[in-house]
């Protein structure tokens, strides 16, 4: 019976994780400047939940693939520069 591959401490797995972070950041930096406002607000709201981060990046990669020559619409895609309905989630006191 075959054994499941084990994760070795300090091996290539961590290095791949670091590269994944940079790829995700580059994807977000590119797409957040080009997507329509409604989609950006939806993604910013989804990013408040850590479990949805991979889904946002996956949707962003698909959007990039479908809209290869999209023009830049804004200088920055962060929540501070683009406040919207997703921004009010943090202001609620429970």
UniProtKB/Swiss-Prot annotation:
The keyword Cell cycle applies. Disulfide bonds: none annotated. Its main location: virion. It is found in: Virion; Host nucleus. GO terms for cellular component: host cell nucleus; virion component. It comes from the Viruses. Keywords: Cell cycle, Host nucleus, Virion. Pfam families: Lentiviral_Tat. Seems to function as a Vpr-like protein, since it mediates host cell cycle arrest in G2 phase. Cell cycle arrest creates a favorable environment for maximizing viral expression and production. This is Probable Vpr-like protein. The gene is tat.
């Amino acid at each position: 019976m075959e054994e499941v591959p084990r994760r070795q401490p300090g091996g290539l797995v961590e290095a791949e994780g670091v590269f994944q972070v940079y790829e995700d950041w580059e994807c977000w930096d590119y797409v957040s400047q080009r997507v329509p406002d409604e989609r950006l607000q939806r993604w910013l709201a989804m990013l408040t939940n850590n479990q949805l981060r991979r889904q946002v990046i996956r949707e962003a990669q698909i959007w990039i693939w479908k809209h290869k020559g999209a023009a830049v619409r804004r200088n920055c895609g962060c929540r501070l520069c683009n406040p919207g309905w997703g921004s009010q989630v943090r202001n609620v006191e429970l």
